[in-house]
Structure formats: C-alpha cells, structure tokens
A protein has these predicted regions:
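Flexible, compositionally biased loop and terminal segments
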Residues: 1-143
C-alpha cells in the first residue's frame, strides 16, 4: 500500500505543482517571504512517527520551498527554524532538533545557490551549533 501511495504521489504531485504555478500571478511576487517552520511535531503525531521524524521531514521540504521561491523570483527568504521557546524542550527532543537544523543549514550551503545569514539570539545556542551555522554561512556564496 505504501508503494502505491508513493507512486501516486510521485505522479500526481508534479501535476499539482505545475497547475499551481500556472495560476500564480508572477507580476505580484513579493520580494521577501518569511516562513515559520512549525507543525512538524503535529505532522509526526498524525502520522504515528517520532518528533525527530517530523522535524527531518520538514527539513527535507526546505529545498523544495526555496526552489519554488527561485522559480517565482522571490529575492529574500527568511526561515524561522527555532524559537527561544524551543530551547526549553527536554534534551531528548531538543538535541535531535538542533542536529537536524545544523544538517539542514550545512546542506543549504553545499548547494551554492543561496547566500545564508543567521539571525537571532545565537548566544543561546550550544557552541557546537553556532560553529556549524557560522561554517555554513562562510561556505555560502557571496551575493
């Protein structure tokens, strides 16, 4: 059943995406889009998966989202990946989330398509994460 669902999704999703793209008014594209990456735990719970799986699934969608923004000429995208409230979560949930963020940002820098900036209260983050984020920013292209 999962294979059938995956196959249908791989066929139908590109058709759906193309239909949406045709309906967009590209003359009204915003210069800057901000997105709060939220709902991954709820998605995981609804799909009987772990929070870590939900956060990983959300992170995998970032590339798709940024690609859509490129296709529609959005110049600046702000992704709110972590709130200070998230930092008060239990370590068993927080640590995997921080690792997923580090991997996601590192992965974005490897594409070489986007200039990365890290904003926010980075002094509240663990040193290892701040280091990884700064390394990713340094590897991203200058634009």
């Amino acid at each position: 059943m999962r294979l059938v669902k995956r196959l249908l999704k791989s066929i139908l999703y590109p058709l759906y995406e193309a239909r949406l793209f045709r309906r967009l008014d590209l003359s009204a594209t915003p210069e800057h889009v901000g997105v709060i990456l939220d709902g991954n735990r709820r998605w995981a719970k609804a799909n009987l998966a772990s929070s870590k799986s939900g956060h990983s699934a959300g992170a995998r969608k970032i590339i798709d989202f940024l690609s859509w923004c490129e296709e529609t000429n959005v110049k600046v995208v702000t992704l709110w990946m972590l709130s200070t409230d998230n930092l008060s979560r239990e370590n068993a949930e927080l640590q995997p989330l921080l690792e997923i963020i580090a991997e996601a940002v590192s992965g974005l820098s490897k594409f070489g398509r986007w200039k990365l900036h890290v904003v926010g209260a980075t002094e509240l983050l663990p040193d290892w994460l701040t280091t990884r984020l700064n390394e990713a920013v340094a590897k991203s292209p200058a634009r």
